[in-house]
Amino acid sequence: MTPILDAERLAVLVHEVRSPVAALSAIAEALEGDTDVDTRREFVRLVTLACRGVERVIADVAVASIRFEPIDPEQLVRDVVAGAVVRGAQVELTVVGELPAIDADPFRLRQALDNLIANALVHGPAESPVSIRAEAASAVLISVTDCGPGIATVELDRIFDVGVQLDPTSRGSGFGLPLARAIVDGHDGSLTVTSSLDEGTTFTIALPLRQA
């Protein structure tokens, strides 16, 4: 069982995140002025380092605050879908067979799934529903698929980086996918993505089965 995030640890994490955020703010201000190519290249390097610092804090927070308990993954997915529908989203759910109980933090897992659905809604056309599929094999698999423009193969590794927005018009924060992956990693699971240009994108959460 992973320990709950307490006030002391939270204070440390807040302190840790201030440095990279301050660096990003300073770089943004500097970029408003006239800078040459070499200076801008150095700024890009510093932004990358600062974002990696934020990523480490996000992962630390996600893992440190996880509380495991036996849950029904099908009910959790249905609850998340119901919440999305209430908010006006078009979501289609398919559950294949019976899903076994797993050990997970229901709050954090809902957060991860909510982030994936929100991402799919942003990038998919308004008239096309987001498709969610849940099934069990060697793990419990939960997939979220949109009918958006897709992601180029060369960009797939970047989408889990903090602050990355492949669509410059997106209103997202750039934190949803990194946080979702950190939460799933904290469950000893995996979050993977497959995509085809002009065909859409699928994110798949794989969660380990309970030990017998």
Predicted segments, located by residue:
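Conserved DHp (HisKA) dimerization/phosphotransfer helix of two-component histidine kinases, i.e.
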Residues: 41-70, 75-87
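Conserved micro-motifs of the catalytic ATP-binding
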Residues: 63-69, 97, 101-104
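Short helix-loop "hinge" at the ATP-lid/N-box region of the Bergerat-fold HATPase_c
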Residues: 119-121
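Short beta-strand/loop element within the Bergerat-fold HATPase_c
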Residues: 127-138
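Short conserved segment of the HATPase_c
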Residues: 151-163
